[in-house]
Amino acid sequence: EHSIFYLAKKDVRSVKITLENKYLENKVDFGNMLRFYKNKVEYINSYIKQTPKKVYLFGAHLFSQNLIYSGLDTLKIVCILDNDLNKQKKRLYGTKFIVRSPKILINDSNALVILNAGIYNDEIEKDIIENINN
């Protein structure tokens, strides 16, 4: 599953609902998610450590914040890239990074872009390759 969303609506009628206790199942899922991000960050950090290129992190959103707070080596990261004009020239909440347009990559053959945008990865990668690095 991609995401879980809840919609709550106030109802004046009182109906007693008993929810199934899913604590143990949810605890396992949460532990798996933490391990997933830990492993992903270790993998990305190995690339960051050995690259001489300028490093950029794509996406001024929770995906990037998760990587950063899971131990991403941010010393070589120049800035956060995002297509959203409303996010550009602002700081990514909870970080020191300013958000810039991916167009700063034009004519930069010495860049490594970390892309961790879930189901949007293919679309973003295609846009960078076809419209920025052409």
Could you tell me what each predicted segment is?
Residues 3-134:
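Hydrophobic, well-ordered beta-alpha structural blocks that scaffold small-molecule cofactor pockets
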